[in-house]
Amino acid sequence: MTKTILGVLSLLVIMSCSIPVKENTVQPNIMETNKKNLGNLLALYPKPMTVVGAEVEGKVNWLVVGHTGVIGHDRILISMSKSHYTNQGIKDSKRLSVNLVSREILPKADYVGSVSGATVDKSEVFAYHIGENGTPVIDASPLTMECEVVDIYETEGFDNFICAIVNTYAAPEVLDNNGKLDYTKLKPVLFEFPTYSYLATGE
């Protein structure tokens, strides 16, 4: 009887060893998706196209800047390549203007973004006046912010100007009946960097 029991137990052990064990191939917390991974592509576009105005070596200069951002509720970021002629003027004066671009002034904005102030006098491309904070304000821009530079954060190849907004000027046609800014009327030109394309708001 004892031999029979031992034989049965031995047979069970052999059978259990011969049964293949399936590996757990399920990876928890990984969701299947049909989205394509584009790597570390910077894709925060389109952005409002702006023309930055500043005084450089005693003369007004204009520069198209597509890399701008909001910091908190009273600061903006203006990110500019270190190679730009305008940077030194901003560093010296610690002030600049940020002018939004409408369709009407897009050709002139495109021009000032394609030539350097180091070799071309761009001071008279736009009709302008000097704002209350001493920066050049484009008359035909639908909205302009005069800013003071409160800090400069340098990254590889770029000067990143942290700016406090001092004055904001808006054209009458972009205001509502209460004199407040109406963003549905503003409709600035947008800029898309990878293909250097201009887009119309809402289109």
Enumerate the predicted regions with their spans.
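A ubiquitous, low-specificity "background" feature that marks scattered single residues
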Residues: 8-9, 184
